Amino acid sequence: EIAQCLVGSEMCIRDRPTDDRQTTGGRNNMKVVSATKVLLYSGLLAERDRETLFEVNALLPQFEYGREYDQESFLVAMQSCFQTTDDREAVTIMASNIVNTQQGTFSDDGVSQQAIIKTGVTTKDAAFVPNPVSLIPYRTFLEVPQPASDFVFRISEGRGGAPAFKLVAADGGLWKSQAVDNVKNYLVKALADVPDREKITIIA
């Protein structure tokens, strides 16, 4: 956990020689640098500088937005890189039932798409591709709520006429500030009962 790692660092700080603790004033700063990185800094040293005491980085599944995936890779990524939501299920069902473009057709007006999907053993129906879709990817520390974002879901013809799928972010990166706030709020609550809590300043 983020908090456990950083609290462990704080315990080490209190075990430092007295001269070191007097130099830093016994205070430390915890900074949420980004949605995936938290640093613990010392107080000001004699050189009016700060020492980086600890760094915690989120380990997350990787998904490349804007990249085209083949059908199998896309379906696996949807299951492993996104939380379960109605829109995720709609995208997954659509992607899993798309007919090879050599057998079916796509129509695209620049805003919405229509594709041929399988509805039975031999039956094929036209279905509109859901857009935009609200999805919740794993993009920040797993201990905190993951921000939802809108994405444009696109289907195109890939190698050999097989369908290809991609998701394009459509929120302008607003999720990043929300994720940083979520991490900060988590740390404030998780460290509330730490001894000398008043000597730790959490900033974002």
Where are these regions (language model features)?
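Single conserved hydrophobic/aromatic residue that forms the stacking wall/gate
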Residues: 1-8, 12-13
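Generic N-terminal initiation segments characterized by hydrophobic and/or small/turn-forming residues
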Residues: 3, 36-37, 50-51, 56-57, ...
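Charged/polar, solvent-exposed surface patches and flexible loops
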Residues: 1, 76-80, 93, 97, ...
